[in-house]
């Protein structure tokens, strides 16, 4: 129930605070290309497929390409309808689990990602490995395609974002018996220099799922951090999703916000600001709450509360000196689990340079991280 879920909430945010406190940032760059990046190994992959087909009919090139096309088109339909049961039939257990969590997050956020009018312009073999005993056979097919892609609110049909443009993706299949199962999808914009190994390892160690390159699919919209001008330019990487104790869905990711949303330490305007963000789904809506930490820097960009927010004073005077709280409803802010005295005391003692923001039933804890550091501590 609600009370049971809230008991886990403070522990979860303590964990996210601890994670953020151990990290410094990394430079994030985007390599924009389409199918070209996947052509680099295409000739070798095609040769592998043809050679394997001479002794194994499952590798027959035309059949393999046609099957990959069918999965590509079927997945778009099932994804648009949040049909996990159908997707589970042609994906590996690992990948279907990952997709299931993403679908769960979409439902909790009241969203759906509709991809229709799909048109495949080209399909090529991008990678292939023919194992001697068939246990590790794998093949990747890269697609150049077009589609009407829109993220929308389920209740109202309101578009959050939309696109209709050519795109490239690499679809990875692994062999299970006499079947090929979809095991993942790669984007051409993936850049290994943005990889944070400790986040990837944390996902592996805790039964969570990691994606190097991630879009704005599950990004909150509104509040202070994700105003429309920042949301539309956000670049999300190192995305981790999983279930924490108590069944609470948690995400961790790095995010670059553009359009000058921040200042350098010298007080100069900055075109890009890097954040490490922890995000959880709350068991109910708390309206809008913003907990802003004052780091006493004269160069720091002060938070201006969104329209409709009012400043809220807590009973603890020292806390008010370090943190400023804004909320759309003072009573809802007072009932918010993370603003109870024990958590506020812990947050104060840790002295973590991070803010907390609540947008309805989504809570995020975020901290600015340096763009020129390359070292990351391991997850706690």
Question: Where are the language model's segments positioned?
Answer:
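Short, solvent-exposed beta-strand/turn "edge" segments of beta-rich domains on protein surfaces
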Residues: 64-66, 132-133, 160, 265-271
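Exposed beta-sheet edge and beta->alpha loop/turn motif
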Residues: 1-14, 132-192
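Hydrophobic structural segments characteristic of membrane proteins
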Residues: 102-150, 157
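Core segments of small alpha/beta cavity-forming domains
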Residues: 44-117, 197, 201
């Amino acid at each position: 129930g609600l009370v049971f879920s809230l008991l886990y909430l403070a522990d979860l945010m303590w964990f996210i605070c601890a994670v953020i406190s151990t990290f410094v940032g990394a430079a994030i760059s985007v390599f924009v290309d389409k199918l070209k990046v996947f052509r680099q190994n295409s000739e070798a992959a095609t040769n592998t497929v043809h050679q394997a087909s001479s002794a194994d009919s499952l590798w027959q090139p035309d059949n393999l390409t046609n099957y990959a096309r069918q999965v590509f088109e079927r997945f778009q339909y099932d994804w648009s309808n949040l049909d996990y049961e159908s997707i589970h039939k042609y994906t590996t257990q690992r990948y279907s689990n990952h997709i299931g969590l993403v679908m769960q997050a979409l439902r909790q956020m009241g969203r759906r990602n509709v991809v229709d009018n799909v048109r495949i312009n080209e399909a090529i073999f991008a990678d292939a490995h023919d194992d001697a005993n068939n246990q590790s056979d794998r093949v990747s097919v890269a697609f150049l395609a077009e589609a009407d892609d829109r993220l929308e609110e389920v209740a109202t049909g309101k578009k959050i974002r939309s696109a209709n443009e050519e795109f490239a993706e690499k679809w990875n299949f692994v062999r299970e018996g006499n079947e090929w199962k979809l095991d993942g999808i790669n984007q051409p914009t993936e850049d290994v220099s943005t990889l944070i190994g400790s986040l990837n390892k944390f996902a592996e160690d805790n039964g969570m799922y990691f994606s190097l390159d991630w879009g704005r699919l599950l990004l909150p919209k509104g509040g202070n951090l994700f105003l429309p001008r920042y949301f539309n330019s956000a670049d999300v990487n190192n995305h981790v999703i999983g279930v924490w104790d108590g069944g609470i869905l948690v995400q961790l990711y790095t995010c670059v916000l553009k359009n000058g949303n921040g200042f350098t330490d010298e007080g100069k305007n900055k075109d890009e600001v890097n954040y490490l963000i922890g995000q959880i789904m709350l068991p109910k809506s708390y309206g809008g709450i913003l907990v802003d930490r004052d780091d006493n820097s004269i160069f720091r960009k002060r938070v201006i509360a969104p329209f409709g927010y009012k400043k809220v004073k807590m009973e603890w005077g020292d806390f008010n000196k370090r943190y400023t709280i804004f909320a759309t409803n003072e009573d809802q802010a007072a009932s918010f689990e993370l603003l109870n005295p024990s958590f506020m005391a812990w947050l104060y003692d840790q002295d973590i340079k991070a803010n907390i923001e609540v947008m309805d039933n989504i809570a995020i804890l975020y901290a600015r991280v340096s763009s020129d550091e390359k070292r990351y501590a391991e997850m706690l």
